Amino acid sequence: MLVWLAEYLVKYHTFFNVFSYLTFRAIVGLLTALIIALWMGPHLIAWLQKMQIGQVVRNEGPESHFSKRGTPTMGGIMILFSIAVSTLLWARLDNPYVWCVLLVLIGYGIIGFIDDYRKVVRKDTRGLIARWKYFWQSVLALAVAFSMYAIGKDTPATQLVVPFFKDVMPQLGMLYILLAYFVIVGTSNAVNLTDGLDGLAIMPTVFVAAGFALVAWATGNVNFASYLKIPYLMHAGELVIVCTAIVGAGLGFLWFNTYPAQVFMGDVGSLALGGALGTIAVLLRQEFLLVIMGGVFVVETLSVILQVGSFKLRGQRIFRMAPIHHHYELKGWPEPRVIVRFWIISLMLVLIGLATLKVR
């Protein structure tokens, strides 16, 4: 939005040229989202406490979690608001990639909000019925997938980028839609599963978003895309703004979510952030890179799948409790140790993922 204003004002003073620089807008976009989140946090937390919108803790969970009962939840509202405002201010709003991510972010946020509202306010332990949750997630994911396929059909925008192989970029055709669907919905639910400890989900989200900011910048730059042997996508550059807004909003939220948490993001935050990361990966043609950089989310999800599968097939559990972060809690690890070690692993995976762009 401000880019258009600056383009009009530049004829009055060359200072406004600075708004045309992607790096400048990325930095101020991050700071804008961070400041909004830091400002909004205390007000939202106070309102959630007043409305008695507190976390519901399962009795079968780790005993250390009982003290979390009643902690304000649905704090993801501040994350989504910060990202949306920052993106609308600093990104070019004629860019279809920006609107795809915002559609999923807000749409999945609404799904998560309804789920949280039913569980916390209506005291319905089921929340939003699973089949309806997946139905609306699917509708939004398919809407984005079909739209982007129509725009980028038979171009690099629908190729599959395979790590380590610079010449392996098959054209997916209609399989693009199927892949996009599973990546967006899968990542959304993976982040949701990971969001079980104070700050556990938000910091890996920040790391992955920061990694994708670099990838988006390279993908949208014809020279760097050629150098790294990845598809050049003309709309990709503006995703840098979205990614840095996620980083800023995530860090602002972490200020209040760090152990011991003053607020939890709830499904309104986790479903939306996961969906946004999945959408960004699809738009950048870096689904495999998401699996590497978002390895913490992948492992958390696999632990649940293996646990459920093992119990149904053999009547035995593999882990003491799933997702796997609860397994380590029940082994006696203090919660902060689990959180920080998962953060370290996440940072390492993001760096490894970025390295694969060059090792081709």
From Swiss-Prot:
Q: Any idea where this protein resides?
A: Cell inner membrane
- Please verify whether the record's keywords include DNA-binding: no
The reaction(s) this protein catalyses: UDP-N-acetyl-alpha-D-muramoyl-L-alanyl-gamma-D-glutamyl-meso-2,6-diaminopimeloyl-D-alanyl-D-alanine + di-trans,octa-cis-undecaprenyl phosphate = di-trans,octa-cis-undecaprenyl diphospho-N-acetyl-alpha-D-muramoyl-L-alanyl-D-glutamyl-meso-2,6-diaminopimeloyl-D-alanyl-D-alanine + UMP
Keywords, sorted A to Z: Cell cycle, Cell division, Cell inner membrane, Cell membrane, Cell shape, Cell wall biogenesis/degradation, Magnesium, Membrane, Metal-binding, Peptidoglycan synthesis, Transferase, Transmembrane, Transmembrane helix
List, alphabetically, the InterPro entries matched: Glycosyl_transferase_4, PNAcMuramoyl-5peptid_Trfase, PNAcMuramoyl-5peptid_Trfase_CS
Q: Name one GO biological process term.
A: peptidoglycan biosynthetic process
Q: Where are the transmembrane segments?
A: 27-47, 71-91, 97-117, 132-152, 168-188, 199-219, 236-256, 263-283, 288-308, 338-358
Pfam family of this protein, just one? MraY_sig1
Q: Membrane topology for this entry?
A: Multi-pass membrane protein
List the cofactors: Mg(2+)
The metabolic or biological pathway listed in the UniProt record of this protein is: Cell wall biogenesis; peptidoglycan biosynthesis
Q: What does this protein do?
A: Catalyzes the initial step of the lipid cycle reactions in the biosynthesis of the cell wall peptidoglycan: transfers peptidoglycan precursor phospho-MurNAc-pentapeptide from UDP-MurNAc-pentapeptide onto the lipid carrier undecaprenyl phosphate, yielding undecaprenyl-pyrophosphoryl-MurNAc-pentapeptide, known as lipid I.
Name of the protein in question: Phospho-N-acetylmuramoyl-pentapeptide-transferase
Organism in which the protein naturally occurs: Proteus mirabilis (strain HI4320)
